[in-house]
């Protein structure tokens, strides 16, 4: 259970320190199998347990340990999870933390695509993007985690319908440490690599699985960091439907669309009207969840439409 992973905080800390010392300071010690920690029953799918089971902060503890030791993976779908698990089980002398929900989720990538994406750890999803080589993106929508990825994709689908000429780039992150500078972590990106993905000056709306300030912490030295706007879990929740919980934390598709509109004043009056429409959709879906205890079919059974 993700929420109860803090029970082993101290054990994780001691093992990570021991691994660091044995790997970097003791030449005669043989490699050992990595410690692989799978966090499931995640924060975003607590339809029955509620607030007490909503705690994604283990990642904040893990990321503080030696960059030679810790790895954090948040695969967006089942094939990416398989690729990640395969990699972690074959590794030695690491602590690999994998965050994956146990509920059913959409499948975005075939196995070959998943292996390539997970090997890179981060990448642009061309099929979900509307920018191309001729036009720079107007905005970057980024995601990290299974539920946040679904909501971010749903937001992009709405933007494509409402603003057909808007150039949106979609970036998905599997390996969280890829966001760190290359000089701080062996998996980190150089500034050139980071800007190639996120641009150097366009607004970024980032939907994250955990506490949003962790992304700000990892990216604070990047070019124009103030343009990176992060959504994530903000200690708002109860026994909620999946969409209702994301709405409470403003990590849902409708709030993400509003975030994009607020950062693109050029959308003008059309943006203002769409913003009001999104607010109405939020109210409608909260009322439905409260009355019926489930999300609308169009939400629960949503599929990528393009």
Language model features by range: what are they?
Residues 1-7, 30, 39-41, 73-76:
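Active-site nucleophile and cofactor-binding loops and adjacent substrate-binding regions
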Residues 1-23:
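Long, structured ligand/cofactor-binding scaffold of large enzymes
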Residues 24-35, 39-60, 67, 84, ...:
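Thiamine diphosphate
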Residues 71-74, 141:
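Short catalytic-loop micro-motif centered on adjacent basic/acidic residues
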């Amino acid at each position: 259970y993700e929420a109860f992973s803090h029970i082993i905080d101290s054990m994780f800390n001691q093992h990570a320190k021991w691994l660091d010392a044995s790997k970097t300071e003791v030449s005669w010690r043989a490699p050992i199998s990595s410690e692989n920690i799978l966090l499931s029953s995640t924060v975003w799918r607590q339809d029955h347990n509620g607030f007490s089971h909503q705690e994604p902060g283990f990642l904040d503890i893990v990321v503080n340990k030696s960059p030679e030791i810790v790895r954090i993976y948040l695969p967006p779908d089942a094939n990416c999870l398989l690729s990640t698990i395969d990699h972690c089980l074959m590794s030695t002398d690491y602590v690999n933390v994998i965050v994956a929900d146990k509920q059913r989720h959409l499948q975005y990538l075939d196995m070959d695509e998943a292996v390539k994406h997970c090997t890179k750890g981060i990448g642009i999803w061309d099929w979900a993007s509307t920018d191309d080589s001729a036009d720079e993106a107007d905005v970057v929508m980024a995601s990290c985690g299974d539920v946040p990825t679904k909501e971010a994709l749903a937001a992009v689908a709405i933007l494509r319908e409402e603003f057909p000429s808007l150039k949106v780039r979609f970036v998905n992150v599997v390996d969280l440490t890829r966001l760190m500078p290359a000089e701080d972590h062996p998996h980190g990106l150089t500034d050139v690599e980071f800007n190639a993905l996120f641009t150097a000056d366009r607004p970024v709306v980032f939907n994250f699985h955990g506490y949003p300030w962790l992304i700000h912490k990892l990216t604070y030295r990047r070019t124009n960091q103030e343009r990176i706007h992060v959504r994530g879990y903000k200690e708002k929740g109860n026994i909620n439907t999946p969409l209702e919980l994301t709405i409470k934390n403003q990590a849902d598709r409708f709030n993400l669309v509003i975030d994009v509109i607020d950062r693109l004043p050029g959308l003008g009056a059309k943006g203002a009207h769409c913003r009001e429409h999104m607010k109405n959709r939020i109210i409608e879906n909260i009322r439905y969840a409260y009355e019926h205890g489930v999300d609308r079919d169009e939400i629960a059974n949503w599929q990528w439409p393009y």
